[in-house]
Amino acid sequence: MATLMNPVRDPNTLSNYNNWLCTHTTANFEIFFEEKKLVGNVVHKLRSITNAETDEIILDSHHVDIRNVQVAGLPVKAWELLPPLGPYGTALKIKLENPVGLNEIIDVDIAVQTTKECTALQWLTPAQTSNKKHPYMFSQCQAIHARSIFPCQDTPDVKCTFDFNITSPLPVIASGLPVRSTSTVPQSGVKTLHRFHQKVPIPSYLFALASGDIAEAAIGPRSVVATSPDKLEECKWELEADTERFIKTIEEIIYPYAWGEYNVLILPPSFPYGGMENPVFTFATPSIISKDRENVDVIAHELAHSWSGNLVTSASWEHFWLNEGWTVYLERRILASLHGEKYRHFSAIIGWKALRDSVEHYSHDHEFTKLVPNLKGEDPDDAFSTIPYEKGFNFLFHLENLVGKEKFDRFIPHYFTTFKGKSLDSYDFKATLLDFFKSDAEASRLLQELDWDSWFYKPGLPPKPEFDTSLADVVYELAGKWRSLPESPFQPQPSDIQGLTANQIVVFLEQILLFERPLTAELSKLMGEVYGLTGSENIEVANLYLQVGLKAADKSVIGPTTDLLGRIGRMKFVRPLYRALQKVDRQVAIDTFEKHKDFYHPICRGMVEKDLFGKKDA
């Protein structure tokens, strides 16, 4: 009966969140660097959403060491870990002695510590940090890894407020606003309690912690950058010119920023993503610090998540495009406001290439190439690709062109107001869009005639939009000259790329990678030398040039490739480089992975293992 009243929308949680709703979580943890574990307890305030119709609470958990459980301040003996169920872990079942009425709230206090199998935490030795002085720890809970830190309702369909009470000998950052105290600044090595409060309800995947040798510098009136002290000045320079401009621009598109501060933590290089939109503190890869301010698009993306994803959230990972497609759309709207509409289209062209690559990797009829895939029984990490980002963007871009940009602009704040603080699925989105335009006969007709089922459920590539290619044409032309070699008289010169942005060089290299007949090893080497690509500090450029060299079977790039694979853990670079390297020399690829696998985050390590040794669904 309860299940019918409150249907579960998320197939990737084992929790009975259709019976109980977490309204607040207090996380009390001490960080033990030597033992590489967190020890403490979590207190969940759970509100009953049935009227005494269930006598058990089921929470997601995976590889956690549970010491004891209390409900309403009293010890509970009748708790157990259920048998493991694939990637979803071993759910914690707590039996209640007394029924709980509708809307009554109970406190569930769980003493817990993490284990070495925890998939959410990465522990770095001092040698793995930039100044090599102190150990470092950071979390990455998306998609379903929060359950490996503490038992919880690990689903984006549930949001609650948070208090963090974290004890550590080193500075701490969390996904809440710091509770500033009047006490003196803690001394390094002395265990100190760090408190944070998150007043905006967030899903479990946005629970975030980091601790290490971290210093901060202001990059705007409501923003700081935090990173290793030896990298602070270069990170400050990279971000201070654009961060506040980005915030003001997106506030004009939607409505004011809701989280108080917008800060950026630049993590050590093993962080597996470009960025993670943890509230208050975006966690970002050091690969954006390119010393030319050309890679800060990542910050525009993570900032946009403060509305799409963090305030308005997909109800399950099957509807992940509602987080990422919207965020890419908003990121490109920010860039268009600052740099012009041509820049938005140019960014979309780069995105289309990434989308095509992902579809080809999976195959055109694969479930994971759908905008709304079926993830029942699947690990959401296996479905992680550019597809929800770029297919989602292209759907929203199509809707914008369908009804007209001016009309769609009015829908944007309406949508983000309607679902503020809530989770939704694709059907909620469709219903809201249709309802908004019902009084506009023309827009309503166009939306009713739209083939929604094809957009949601058809695998492969969507229809390709007409992009403004003006910023791309110059690099298409240059790529065409390289395609004509060695037969043509074209002689490459450094002036060929003079005045091009890093993103234009990225598109140029992506065009080279599309050649049906790869460059010869000699031409690949010539390109690197003449255009200065071999020593580029911009990893977006360097990694693509290495892929060009590997595709050309240029043995001279194998060394730089293995070197880069030992310096960066961002999956965007690591996975394609390993795939390309193994085609040239599989043993070198395997040896490189074995050498560096402990450097990579567990999520990245697992995905590369699948790429090198396992199933194609990765």
Curated annotation (Swiss-Prot):
Enzyme class: hydrolase
Localization: Cytoplasm; Nucleus
Keywords: Cytoplasm, Hydrolase, Metal-binding, Metalloprotease, Nucleus, Protease, Zinc
Entry-linked InterPro entries: Aminopeptidase_N-like_N, Aminopeptidase_N-like_N_sf, ARM-type_fold, LTA4H, LTA4H_cat, M1_LTA-4_hydro/amino_C_sf, M1_LTA4H, Peptidase_M1
Binding site for a peptide: 140-142, 272-277
Active-site residue list: 302 (proton acceptor), 389 (proton donor)
Needed cofactors: Zn(2+)
Gene3D superfamilies cross-referenced by the UniProt entry: 3.30.2010.30, Neutral Protease Domain 2 (1.10.390.10), Peptidase M1, leukotriene A4 hydrolase/aminopeptidase C-terminal domain (1.25.40.320), tricorn interacting facor f3 domain (2.60.40.1730)
Cytoplasm among keywords: yes
GO terms classed as biological process: cytoplasm to vacuole targeting by the NVT pathway; lipid metabolic process; peptide catabolic process; protein catabolic process; proteolysis
PROSITE patterns: ZINC_PROTEASE
EC number: 3.4.11.-, 3.3.2.10
Pfam families reported in the protein's UniProt record: Leuk-A4-hydro_C (PF09127), Peptidase_M1 (PF01433), Peptidase_M1_N (PF17900)
Entry similarity comment: Belongs to the peptidase M1 family.
PANTHER family: LEUKOTRIENE A-4 HYDROLASE (PTHR45726:SF3)
This protein's name: Leucine aminopeptidase 2
Species for this entry: Emericella nidulans (strain FGSC A4 / ATCC 38163 / CBS 112.46 / NRRL 194 / M139) (Aspergillus nidulans)
